[in-house]
């Protein structure tokens, strides 16, 4: 379970934007995050989010002290568990602590006792049991562990309104303790594309949850069309799935048109987006979908599965236009049909591109994310309490 360096200027809000949040001096929040958060070979939306808010929170009154927690979260070995326990134990009483849920939610025996003396908030990028391909017993155990952690802390932060609703209903949390801080987006130059239609792009780690096999099946059904596709994302999370995907690509005879490039970052990733005509995302589960807003920030339309928080990420242009198409999950035929429509109907392309440019202008920046997080941290109770 589980991107690359982002080029941007950290948020510098005015006092008026920040009314009621900025104190006379910076307060400290201790941010406990996965040990691989800076690893360019293992990019993820969660890692990118964590890194970005570390740089933007000071603009909203919070100095961030980072604590990397090495380990195979949410299934840590003894050394990782001991390391996390030591990190939390060494923090002073009443310290404000933001915990990445990938680290925190699987180890209630470590986190819950610390909620008695620390002011804890847990940032949930993806509910642990929602990872695709888990054994039912493993998913149930992770679910139970996560529930114990989230019920013990005074604040839970999710990355979409959909995720807030899911956490409240699934774990029986008090709605006033679950907050949204959706990822922001950096507006980038409009993508020139390739020819306006044929270059497809999927930016996602190659894992069962991202469902690239469904993309392969859909592309095989429209092999008569002149498309090329790049799947950009880490290949090290699930080598077995990557091998299966390569076999599938070869079986369909698509190897010369569909490439698994591995992760890209910086100028290479920017160039990849600049050449794209359509973003395609075939996930089984997403709490938001940062790759979608990264595409829309460049005016690239989106074709994605209608799951989780993806509809929020796609959103609408100010005039109500949809900058993307949402298809039912588990339906490669519907995906193929929409691809055929994209290629065959110029009016569809024009409409989607116009809406994508409108949505681009309306996207919230990362300052909105940092402001939301700062507000949650500011409101953490002075004395930790047990939360039901």
Residue spans of the language-model regions?
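Membrane-proximal helix-turn-helix segments that form the acceptor-binding/catalytic region
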Residues: 137-156
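Short alpha-helical donor nucleotide-sugar binding micro-motif in glycosyltransferases
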Residues: 263-264, 271-276
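Conserved acidic donor-binding segment of nucleotide-sugar-dependent glycosyltransferases
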Residues: 316-332, 341-346
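Short hydrophobic beta-strand element within catalytic cores of glycosyltransferases
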Residues: 301-304, 308
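Conserved donor-binding/catalytic core segment of Leloir-type glycosyltransferases
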Residues: 157, 191-210, 216-221, 230
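Carbohydrate-associated surface elements
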Residues: 162, 184
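Nucleotide-activated donor-binding/catalytic signature segment of Leloir-type glycosyltransferases, i.e.
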Residues: 242-264
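Aromatic "clamp/platform" in nucleotide-sugar-dependent glycosyltransferases that forms part
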Residues: 284
């Amino acid at each position: 379970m589980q991107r690359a360096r982002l080029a941007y200027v950290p948020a510098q809000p005015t006092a008026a934007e920040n009314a009621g949040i900025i104190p006379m001096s910076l307060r400290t929040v201790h941010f406990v995050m996965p040990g691989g958060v800076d690893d360019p070979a293992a990019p993820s939306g969660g890692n990118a989010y964590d890194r970005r808010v570390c740089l933007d929170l000071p603009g909203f009154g919070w100095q961030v002290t980072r604590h990397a927690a090495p380990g195979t979260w949410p299934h840590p070995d003894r050394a990782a568990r001991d390391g996390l326990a030591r990190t939390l134990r060494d923090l002073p009483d009443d310290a404000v602590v933001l915990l990445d849920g990938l680290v925190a939610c699987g180890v209630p025996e470590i986190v819950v006792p610390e909620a008695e003396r620390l002011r804890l908030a847990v940032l949930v990028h993806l509910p642990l049991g929602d990872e695709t391909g888990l054994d039912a017993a493993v998913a149930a155990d992770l679910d139970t562990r996560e529930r114990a952690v989230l019920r013990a802390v005074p604040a839970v932060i999710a990355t979409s309104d959909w995720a807030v609703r899911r956490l409240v209903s699934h774990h029986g949390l008090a709605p006033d303790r679950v907050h949204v801080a959706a990822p922001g987006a950096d507006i980038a130059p409009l993508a020139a594309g390739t020819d306006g239609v044929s270059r497809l792009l999927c930016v996602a780690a190659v894992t069962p949850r991202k469902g690239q096999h469904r993309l392969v099946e859909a592309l095989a059904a429209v092999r008569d069309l002149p498309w090329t596709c790049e799947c950009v994302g880490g290949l090290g999370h699930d080598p077995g799935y990557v091998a299966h995907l390569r076999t599938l690509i070869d079986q369909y005879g698509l190897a010369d048109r569909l490439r698994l490039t591995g992760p890209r970052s910086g100028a290479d990733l920017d160039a990849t987006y600049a050449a794209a005509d359509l973003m395609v995302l075939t996930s089984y589960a997403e709490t938001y979908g940062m790759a979608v807003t990264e595409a829309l920030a460049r005016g690239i339309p989106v074709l994605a599965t209608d799951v989780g928080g993806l509809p929020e990420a796609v959103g609408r242009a100010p005039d109500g236009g949809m900058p993307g198409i949402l298809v039912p999950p588990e339906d490669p035929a519907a995906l193929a049909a929409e691809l055929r429509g994209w290629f065959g109907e110029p009016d569809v392309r024009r409409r989607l591109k116009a809406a994508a440019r409108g949505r681009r202008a309306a996207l919230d920046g990362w300052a909105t994310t940092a402001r939301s997080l700062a507000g949650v941290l500011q409101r953490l109770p002075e004395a930790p309490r047990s939360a039901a």
